[in-house]
C-alpha cells in the first residue's frame, strides 16, 4: 500500500502554527525512508502527552474523577443535546430511522447545566454540543449562555449540519459560542440530497459563509469520506481552503449500528493523503497538540488548512481526553465502546454532587487503553451515531 510519511523537523512540545512536519509520499515504486521508527515516535508522543498533563494539572488542579487508570486526563466533554435531526445521513442514521427516547427521559436544560458544571469544576475546559442536530433544540441559545458562564470553561463549541445555523449563529455567538464544526460530505447538491436523504445543500454553504463573516477562524468542515460516494471530491474540498479560513477535516468512515458499514467503503488516510499530495505537493504537517485527534496540515498559498481524523487506520487512543454525555443522560467514556452509565437516574433520585462525582470517576477508571480493531468494532453492539453525537 502506498503510504505518506512524516519527518519531524522541530520537536518543540509547545503548539505553534509555525512548527511543521514535512510530508513525503511513497508513490509507485519510489519510496521515502521514515526517519523515526514507530516505537520512537510512540515514545515521543507519550513523553509530550505526559508533559502536557503535568502542565494541565499545574494550570488547573483537577479532581481524580477525570483521570483514568492509564493516566489520561479528560478535559473535553461532548454533550448531545437531542437525538432529533433534520437530515438522515447514511453513515449516521439507519434508513428506517431510529426510535427516539421519550422527551421526559431526556436531560432538561437545568440538568445539562448542572452536570456540565460538575465536569468543569473538576477540570474540563472544553465542551462541544452535538446531537442529533443540536440547533433543532429550541433552548439551545439559553443552554449556550449558561454553559459559557461556567467558571473554568475555555471553549464552547458545536458540531452542526448547518441547515438552520445561518439564522441562529449571530445570537449563538452572543451567547458565548466560541467555535464550530459544520458537517458537509459533498459539494454537489444532487449528491447531498442522496447522502442526507434531504434537500439543503445551499443552506449549509450559506452557514459556512455566515460563520466566516462573523469572524469564526477557522470554520471547520467535517467530511466523512466513503468510497464510491464522495472520494472523487477530496481535492475539491481542499480547494475550499485556498481563499477562505476553512479547516477541512477528512474523517474515516466508522462503523455504528444501522449505517451498513463495510470495510470496502473505508478510504484509509494514506490513500486520501496520496491524492492530496499529488495535487498539492507543498502540503506541510503542522505540529499537533498532544491531545489532538487530527493530523493537521497547511498548503502554501492557502488561507485555510486540511486535517485527517484516522479513527480506523491509525487510532489516537493514547492521547484521548474526551468524555461523552448523551441526550438521555447516559455517560460514555469511549465513542466505540458499548459501556454506558446513567447520570440522569441518580440525579433525579436526589444524588448530591459528591455521589455523582463518584459515579463519573468510577466510569472513567474503567476506560480501556484503546478501542478494538476496526473489524471488531463493526461486530460490537453500539448505538447509531445519531444517538451518540460523535
Curated annotation (Swiss-Prot):
Entry binding sites for [4Fe-4S] cluster 2: 317, 320, 334
Radical SAM core domain span: 69-290
GO cellular component: chloroplast; mitochondrial matrix; mitochondrion
Binding of [4Fe-4S] cluster 1, residues: 85, 89, 92
Principal location class: mitochondrion
Signal sequence range: none
PANTHER family referenced in this protein's UniProt entry, alphabetically: MOLYBDENUM COFACTOR BIOSYNTHESIS PROTEIN 1, MOLYBDOPTERIN COFACTOR SYNTHESIS PROTEIN A
Family note: Belongs to the radical SAM superfamily. MoaA family.
SUBUNIT field: Homodimer.
Name of this chain's protein: GTP 3',8-cyclase, mitochondrial
UniProt source species: Arabidopsis thaliana (Mouse-ear cress)
Amino acid at each position: 500500500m502506498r503510504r505518506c510519511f512524516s519527518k519531524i523537523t522541530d520537536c518543540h512540545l509547545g503548539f505553534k502554527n509555525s512548527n511543521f512536519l514535512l510530508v513525503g509520499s511513497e508513490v509507485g515504486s519510489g519510496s521515502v525512508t521514515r526517519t523515526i521508527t514507530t516505537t520512537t515516535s510512540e515514545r515521543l508522543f507519550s513523553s509530550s502527552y505526559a508533559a502536557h498533563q503535568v502542565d494541565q494539572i499545574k494550570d488547573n488542579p483537577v479532581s481524580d474523577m477525570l483521570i483514568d487508570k492509564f493516566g489520561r486526563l479528560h478535559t473535553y466533554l461532548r454533550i448531545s443535546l437531542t437525538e432529533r435531526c433534520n437530515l438522515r445521513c447514511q453513515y449516521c442514521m439507519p434508513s428506517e430511522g431510529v426510535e427516539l427516547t421519550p422527551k421526559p427521559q431526556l436531560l432538561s436544560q437545568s440538568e445539562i447545566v448542572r452536570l456540565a458544571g460538575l465536569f468543569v469544576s473538576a477540570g474540563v475546559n472544553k465542551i462541544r454540543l452535538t446531537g442529533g442536530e443540536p440547533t433543532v433544540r429550541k433552548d439551545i441559545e439559553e443552554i449556550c449562555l449558561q454553559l459559557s458562564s461556567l467558571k473554568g470553561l475555555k471553549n464552547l463549541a458545536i458540531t452542526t449540519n448547518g441547515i438552520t445555523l445561518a439564522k441562529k449563529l449571530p445570537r449563538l455567538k452572543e451567547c458565548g459560542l466560541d467555535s464550530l464544526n459544520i458537517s458537509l460530505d459533498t459539494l454537489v447538491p444532487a449528491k447531498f440530497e442522496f447522502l442526507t436523504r434531504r434537500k439543503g445543500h445551499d443552506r449549509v454553504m450559506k452557514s459556512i459563509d455566515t460563520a466566516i463573516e462573523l469572524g469564526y477562524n477557522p470554520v471547520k468542515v467535517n467530511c466523512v469520506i466513503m468510497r464510491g460516494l464522495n472520494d472523487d471530491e477530496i481535492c475539491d474540498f481542499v480547494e475550499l481552503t485556498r481563499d477562505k479560513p476553512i479547516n477541512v477535516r477528512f474523517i474515516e468512515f466508522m462503523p455504528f449500528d444501522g449505517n451498513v458499514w463495510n470495510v470496502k467503503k473505508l478510504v484509509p488516510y494514506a490513500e486520501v493523503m496520496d491524492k492530496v499530495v499529488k495535487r498539492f505537493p507543498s502540503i506541510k504537517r503542522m505540529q499537533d497538540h498532544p491531545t489532538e485527534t487530527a493530523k493537521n496540515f497547511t498548503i502554501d498559498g492557502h488561507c485555510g488548512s486540511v486535517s485527517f481524523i484516522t479513527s480506523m487506520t491509525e487510532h489516537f487512543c493514547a492521547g484521548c481526553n474526551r468524555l461523552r454525555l448523551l441526550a438521555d443522560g447516559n455517560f460514555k467514556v469511549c465513542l466505540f465502546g458499548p459501556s454506558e452509565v446513567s447520570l440522569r437516574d441518580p440525579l433525579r433520585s436526589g444524588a448530591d454532587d459528591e455521589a455523582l462525582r463518584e459515579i463519573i470517576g468510577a466510569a472513567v477508571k474503567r476506560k480501556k487503553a484503546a478501542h478494538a480493531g476496526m473489524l471488531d468494532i463493526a461486530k460490537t453492539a453500539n448505538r447509531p451515531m445519531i444517538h451518540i453525537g460523535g
